[in-house]
Amino acid sequence: MPLEIIAMEQVKMMANKLWGGRFDKAADGEMYSFLSSENVALDTALIAYDIEGSLAHVCMLAKQGIIAKKEAGEILSALAAVQKKAGEGKFSLDPALEDVHTNVEAAVTAITANGKKMHTARSRNDQVSLDTRMYMRVAINEVSAALLELQASLLELSKKDCVFPTYTHTQVAQPASLLFWCHAHHCEIERDLERLSQLYARVNECPLGSGAVAGTTWNIDRNYTAKLLGFSAPTANPMDSVGSRGELEAELLSHLYLAMAHASKIATDVILLANKRLIVLPDEYSTGSSMMPQKKNPDPFELVRGKASRMLGLYVHAAGLLKSVPSGYNLDSQESKYALLQGVKTAEQSFSILAHALPLLKFDKEEIVLELEKGYACATELADLLAKKGVPFRSAHSVAGGIVKECIAKKKFLSALSASEVSAVAGVKITDAELKEAVSVDKVARFSAAYKIPAASAHAKALEARVKALDAAHALLEKEVKALVK
């Protein structure tokens, strides 16, 4: 028999040791690949968390007297060796071993036979829930950091403050300022950060000890493992802990979709304003055409917009997995891993691109004023002026609309009108100074100066606290491991 076939058979035997006791035949190769090949590739992102979870679990087994401290020390030493290898990028997962949990256990058992005791009072069901929650905590923190960076870039961009157009139905609406535009998007991101912070509290509960579905009769200490891993508390119910896999993932993806929708809105504004030549795209974040020499394309902004659509698809993928599954653990939920990992990566990349590109935008102030003049953006203020003079607003609205129609016909702007012309049409006396105040783009835009972007978000402090809590838990776990490793 060729050596590679012998090796594969040996690998299958190793994998089957986890659950092969009641089987007479080895798993079909195609079926095994269908179950594991893609999953194992994705599991690479969970290696560090799986090892860390095992370190805490073994410490707990020793603390509770379930395994001897000497045995625990040997297992922990082996786990540390695997951890070091993984940190150096030298620990690759074998698809034939089904998942990250089996790969880690096999690597530990190859170092010490006591590795076979590592899985006592534990199931891969609560393991994968643990790994996922640990990954999600870090992911939420990293995405939050990326959003805070995007907020900071909006603050930096707002310092270039100038008159800025607003639009409804993609038509010119009213004059505002660049600061006003930046503040609006800053507010959107604040909501994104708030949602992520709220989700973090739900994610930050430890499922370890839930077992396959109904817990375990071993005398485990779930509070201890939760503390070692930096969780606020153990989850309340084992069946819910393993049976709700995919729910938190779908919730995160829903929040990321909303954040990406906000990013898409920013990107689309940039694209449209560049098309109107009101802003100049930075060379560093533009591309050209292979055929047309004059082109300067907003490709990264278009791709951010496109990736928002991807995020929606990933959310629907994850949310769909929750439908029509019975209570307890089901392998359908494995599919949520792809959506989760892709979603986090997509969000971080998109927010980073915008954060770096936005401060480099340049603005053509003359073109912006012309855009507002051509769009008769001060017509609302003109109607308001007439209303302040005693004309009912509905009548003032009609008069202002008629004035705009007349200006369009005569190809002139509101700023070219005289007070006497407007007074004659409106039937009320207004002065030149009052009219100038009402139809001057610069003056009307002043109202938006009241909108200020805070220099620091409260969410930055919350993020810092979460990161510090995880660091403290790492230090505690390291201390407990060292106490058992001689």
Region roles according to the model:
Residues 10-53, 114, 277, 292-486:
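Glycine-rich cofactor/substrate-binding loops
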Residues 66-67, 231, 391, 412:
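Helix N-cap/coil-helix junction residues
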Residues 59-67, 180, 250-258, 381-390:
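Short, well-ordered beta-strand elements within core beta-sheets of diverse protein domains
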Residues 9-215, 220-226, 288, 417-447:
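A helix-coil-helix interface module used to build multimeric assemblies
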Residues 59, 63, 84-91, 109, ...:
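Charged/polar positions within long, soluble alpha-helices
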Residues 77-85, 243-246, 402-407:
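A short structural micro-motif
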Residues 133-139, 144-145, 159, 165, ...:
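Charged, flexible cofactor/metal-binding loops and thiol motifs
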